[in-house]
Amino acid sequence: MELAEIRNTAEWMEKKLDEYKASLDLETKISRIEELENEMTYPDFWNNQESAQKVIDESNGLKAMVDKYQHLADGHENIVLTYELIKEEPDVELQEELESELGDIKKKFDEFELQILLNGEYDANNAILELHPGAGGTESQDWASMLLRMYQRFCDKQGWKVETMDYQPGDEAGVKSVTLRIQGHNAYGYLKAEKGIHRLVRISPFDSSGRRHTSFVSCDVMPEFNDDIDIEIRTEDLRVDTYRASGAGGQHINTTDSAVRITHVPTGVVVSCQQERSQIKNREAAMKMLKAKLYQREIEEKQKKLDEIRGEKSDIAWGSQIRSYVFHPYSMVKDHRTNYEVGNTQGAMDGDIMGFIDAYLRLMNM
């Protein structure tokens, strides 16, 4: 790499840092961190643990953003200083180190830019993720369990906490449906990219003839809302059923009817929760999920009306998959919205899906 190229890269970084500083309004974020840290010193801070956790999560998210910006600024400063040294007194070894450092920090700039793209109203929220197999019985239910593992691995890599709110085991293998609550800064902002139909093509382990099968699973993702979201839910519109909770493999995980299923009769929206041992707590959690689903439904209906006005039509049939995972006759995972693809299917199934999410978020912000 020529010195002129190093200088151009350093100038590009300086320009990017100025853009980031303006768009992020860093001074306001730093002031907000101070407010939150002051709030944490109140004697009654932990009286409401849920409220306290929200304050901590907001503070951690803001700190992470400010710290990452500062890390990039420090890296840029170091590159400029090293460049000036080499320009005055050429040093091959030092220049090679600088070139390597440039590659690393440029990658960090790309990662930081992705985080800035998460500027939606609810992107910072926790996420509720649901998986529902399509037709195909055991095949699709097994595919749902594979996707469940993939998302659990992905969330682990992000340092997010995953709770299984509802789990309906498959008849022979896999799952009939599963609902996860994912706690972490920007969980919804990232995972919204996964909403849609996921298609698998493979040689079936359940087919003695070794034939190739295609399976589908629907992934739904919603933001988890705080209590301040304005959604009217009338008690008379709800049907509440209780049942005995089941764990993976079909075993009962509770000896009482603590699991709760709530049906919103006017819309037919159904939510279930069996995470807690207490029926009251399961009902509270289910009501949060219902609120999220009804809000999401309201947004989608508004979007549908806008699409009709514009003459657009969204196809939500099983054929409109967002991503295909092909295990046979070749190995490839391809996102049909962005055309981003990888040949390492095992890596994707182990949770390495940030590349797909990155490509989708960049496409949506073009």
From Swiss-Prot:
Return the Gene3D superfamilies for the record.
3.30.160.20, 3.30.70.1660, Release factor
Pfam assignment, any one: RF-1
Entry's localization field: Cytoplasm
Its cellular-component GO annotations read: cytoplasm
Keywords on record: Cytoplasm, Methylation, Protein biosynthesis
Highest taxon, organism lineage: Bacteria
- Its predominant location is cytoplasm
Briefly state the modifications made to the protein after translation.
Answer: Methylated by PrmC. Methylation increases the termination efficiency of RF2.
The PTM N5-methylglutamine maps to Q251
Q: Which GO terms describe its molecular function?
A: translation release factor activity, codon specific
The Swiss-Prot or TrEMBL record describes its family as follows:
Belongs to the prokaryotic/mitochondrial release factor family.
Q: What does this protein do?
A: Peptide chain release factor 2 directs the termination of translation in response to the peptide chain termination codons UGA and UAA.
HAMAP family per the UniProt record, alphabetical: Rel_fac_2
| Listed name of the protein | Peptide chain release factor 2
| Organism, as annotated | Exiguobacterium sibiricum (strain DSM 17290 / CCUG 55495 / CIP 109462 / JCM 13490 / 255-15)
